[in-house]
Curated annotation (Swiss-Prot):
This is ATM interactor. Its main location: nucleus. One of its GO terms (biological process) is positive regulation of non-motile cilium assembly. Keywords: Activator, DNA damage, Metal-binding, Nucleus, Repeat, Transcription, Transcription regulation, Zinc, Zinc-finger.
Length: 823
């Protein structure tokens, strides 16, 4: 303690005399050397300088001469500034030290004036600078200077500055807080050498080892800083190990094998495999190998990639078996072709390929459903998606044969057939009486020739499990585009039927359900839509319209008498060629006169009847005629006649409770809305493509709503298919109560927008039928009709006239109830 106080007193005395003593010595040394300051020659550490004449040492190259700087005591005792706030107003940045502040001021604010120790680039030509301690008698004087200012400051603060920081354990004092902290780490510890000599600090131990050459102990080899780093790393490693252990205790989510494999599924095209009784054939993917716990809910829809579908533009989404998603069809317009995204309701899909644009037929006729156990049937969903096309031909090459030659540019068909019934076995009855058939199809047919006819059909059926229900929704958009005329045909049909189940059983022949859809199509198209058959309608084999038409199967007459069947079919003929009459010979003819006009006065060129829904269909190897055999074609002069029709038909079938248990009640609700547009080819078309030099335009709007309620079980068969076969221009009803109301509205005869007169007509017909069965053969019939027609239905109408006449006929008929005993 006394030594430290004496050293402090000597230091204070040196501080008092050092300011003038050191410069004097430096000046004297410089004057004696008569040149720049040169540091003394090298000597051993801890040795004292010896006189020059005492020993002769070899000449050693002198270090380069430099500038010797002796800083003042106040400059060395100045505290180091930390966390310095930038002096520029509004900056607010805090710098860790003064050099960082100077760098910030120069680089960020471009300020160099008033900076303490500004950053100046060192001149390479100037010599090095040396810094010596200002305390007189200090060994780190001019003879042993420091190369950096920080080193001389550290020396001064450690050896000569006031020791303000004291240790609480050993009462030692230190000039800086950092020195006290370093001492606290080693305070009270004993550093023992391998020879057994103890030391109070690691530094003293290192000095002993350096002098004696002993081996340093392993626990003291690493410096304290490195030990601290190693301890921190070990602590962090422990924390990480604990975290990993806690995570290992929890279940780790793993990727679902089913989801990963679902994108690579290839659906089998065989109905027999998809209808097998084994459950493994009805699952899309294999079950996971081990149980898995998902953090997120499992998705309900899986995307099925079908790489073999080369021409398809409609992706198919197949939900899982336990999915509650509803079937959805989304249409996407992709230019000329119409795409769709179809969500199939169940988990089994089938893809059928092998289509050709000319002779469109599938690979082979699909086999029948063969199941060993007729009772253990499971729900099966089959999806058929077909798209095939051909490059369009040049329209200029087909000016002479417009009606005889048409090429397919794009055909896109998507079908979904769901069978929730039991089994499909020929010549056998089903085990239960519940059956349901759901079909959803979309067709895009476009013809690149003089007559362009794209057609889009959408069909959807909803069937509950308790009753046999059939619903068909069809929408057809047909457009005709030639170099001389243009027109548009739009048809929308929706049918809903509900039938009460009875004891009768249904037997269906599903042979070749989808195999022969396009089997007999060459340049013409003949696709027949069949019946939606329920178990309360027939009890014998029923013809399915998708079968080849050269092998038709008819119904038994006895069965037809016992249980009526509703047959829906349609023909795309624009106008009917004959009248429709049912078993009761009650007919409503709307366009019979117009038909005669078109068939007699326009024989110039024949319009090719592309029968999409026809009754007669030759074999697959036989070329179809230009028109149906049973219906003569209607001649049109394409250059003089233009026809476009927009037909929207909505049909709903509802079930009425019967008063007796034996008869089966059937109800039919038909609502038809027709927009019929007739114009000369030289007249201007509204909303259609064509020339702008039209001379005459006539419009006819017809809206018909018909409600047909119950057909008794004893009544003869009502061929509704024949009714709808001729474009719904003639309607035959067999109902007890009929009410028809027709309104016709005509616009002014002179319209300044056209060169000639334009006549607009609107006809609306509403028919309601209802009845009640009392004695089994008694009908109460009441008919009321009101009609308004225009003169274009007359036989003497000329299409090329500049003026047209208007005539209105209103008829109202009321029939009293009467009794009918025999049908």
């Amino acid at each position: 303690m006394a030594a430290s106080e004496a050293a402090a007193a000597a230091g204070s005395a040196a501080l008092a005399a050092g300011a003038r003593a050191v410069p004097a010595a430096t000046t004297g040394a410089a004057a004696a050397a008569s040149g720049p300051w040169v540091p003394p020659g090298p000597r051993l550490r801890g040795s004292r300088p010896r006189p020059a004449g005492a020993t002769q040492q070899p000449a050693v190259p002198a270090p380069p001469a430099g500038e010797l700087i002796q800083p003042s005591v106040s400059e060395l005792s100045r505290a180091v500034r930390t966390n310095i706030l930038c002096t520029v107003r509004g900056c607010g940045k805090i710098l860790p030290n003064s050099p960082a502040l100077n760098m910030h001021l120069v680089k960020s604010h471009r300020l160099q004036d008033g900076i303490v120790n500004p950053t100046i680039r060192k001149d390479l030509k100037t010599g090095p600078k040396f810094y010596c301690c200002p305390i007189e008698g200090c060994p780190r004087g001019p003879e042993r200077p420091f190369s950096q200012f920080s080193l001389v400051k550290q020396h001064f603060m450690k050896m000569h500055a006031e020791k303000k920081h004291k240790c609480s354990k050993c009462s030692n004092s230190y000039g800086t807080e950092w020195d006290l902290k370093r001492h606290a780490e080693d305070c009270g510890k004993t550093f023992r050498c391998t020879c057994g000599c103890p030391y109070a600090s690691r530094t003293a131990l290192q000095s002993h080892i350096y002098r004696t050459g002993h081996e340093i102990p392993a626990e003291h080899r690493d410096p304290p800083s490195k030990k601290r780093k190693m301890e921190n790393c070990a602590q962090n490693q422990k924390l990480s190990n604990k975290t990993i252990e806690s995570l290992n205790n929890q279940p780790i989510p793993r990727p679902d094998t089913q989801e990963l494999e679902a994108s690579e599924i290839k659906l089998e095209p065989s109905f027999e495999d998809s209808c097998g009784s084994n459950t493994d054939k009805q699952t899309l993917t294999t079950p996971p190998r081990y149980p898995q716990k998902l953090l997120l809910p499992k998705p309900k829809v899986a995307l099925v990639k079908l790489p073999v579908m080369q021409f398809s533009v409609m992706p198919v989404f197949v939900p899982t078996a336990d999915s509650s998603a509803q079937p959805v069809v989304l249409g996407v317009d992709q230019g000329s072709a119409t795409g769709a995204v179809h969500l199939m309701p169940l988990s089994v899909g089938t893809l059928i390929l092998g289509l050709d644009s000319e002779a469109c037929s599938l690979k082979e006729s699909l086999p029948l459903f063969k199941i060993a156990n007729p009772i253990a049937g499971e729900p099966i969903s089959t999806g058929v998606q077909v798209n095939f096309g051909k490059s369009p031909s040049n329209p200029l090459q087909e000016l002479g044969n417009t009606c005889q030659k048409n090429s397919i540019s794009s055909i896109n068909v998507q079908t979904d057939l769901s069978y929730a019934s039991q089994n499909f076995i020929p010549s056998a009855q089903w085990a239960t009486a519940d059956s349901s058939v759901s079909s959803c199809s979309q067709t895009d047919l476009s013809f690149d020739s003089q007559v362009s006819l794209p057609i889009s059909v959408h069909t959807q059926t909803f069937l509950p499990s308790s009753k046999v229900t059939s619903s068909i929704a069809a929408q057809t958009d047909a457009f005709m585009d030639t170099c001389f005329q243009s027109g548009g045909v739009s048809r929308e049909t929706q049918t809903s039927g509900i039938e009460s189940p009875t004891d009768d059983h249904v037997q269906m022949d599903q042979a070749g359900m989808c195999g022969d859809i396009f089997e007999s199509v060459h340049s013409s198209y003949n696709v027949a839509t069949g019946n939606i058959i329920s178990n309360s309608l027939v009890a014998e084999t029923v013809t399915h319209s998708l079968l080849p038409q050269n092998e038709p199967k008819t119904l038994n007459q006895d069965i037809e008498k016992s249980a009526p069947i509703i047959n829906f079919s349609a023909q795309n003929s624009m106008l009917p060629s004959q009248n429709m009459t049912d078993n009761q010979t009650q007919t409503i003819d709307l366009l019979s006169d117009l038909e005669n006009i078109l068939s007699s006065n326009l024989p110039a060129q024949t319009l090719d009847h592309r029968s999409l829904l026809s009754d007669t269909n030759p074999g697959p190897d036989t070329q179809l005629p230009s028109g149906p055999a049973q219906n003569p074609g209607i001649d049109f002069d394409i250059e003089e006649f233009f026809s476009a029709s927009n037909i929207q038909t909505q049909t709903e079938e509802s079930e009425l409770s019967t008063m007796t248990t034996e008869p089966v009640l059937e109800s039919l609700d038909i609502e038809t809305q027709t927009d019929f547009l007739l114009a000369d080819t030289s007249a201007q078309s509204y909303g259609c493509r064509g020339n702008s030099n039209f001379l005459g335009l006539e419009m006819f709007d017809t809206q018909t709503q018909t409600d047909l309620n119950f057909f008794l079980d004893s009544s003869p068969h009502l061929p509704l298919g024949s009714i709808l076969k001729h474009s719904s221009f003639s309607v035959s009803t067999d109902s007890s109560d009929t009410e028809t109301q027709t309104e016709g509205v005509s616009t002014a005869k002179n319209i300044p927008a056209l060169e000639s007169k334009v006549q607009l007509n609107s006809t609306e017909t509403q028919t309601m039928s209802s009845g009640f069965e009392t004695l089994g053969s008694l009908f109460f019939t009441s008919n009321e009709t009101q009609t308004a027609m225009d003169d274009f239905l007359l036989a003497d109408l000329a299409w090329n006239t500049m003026e047209s006449q208007f005539s209105s006929v209103e008829t109202q008929t009321s029939a009293e109830p009467h009794t009918v005993s025999n049908f």
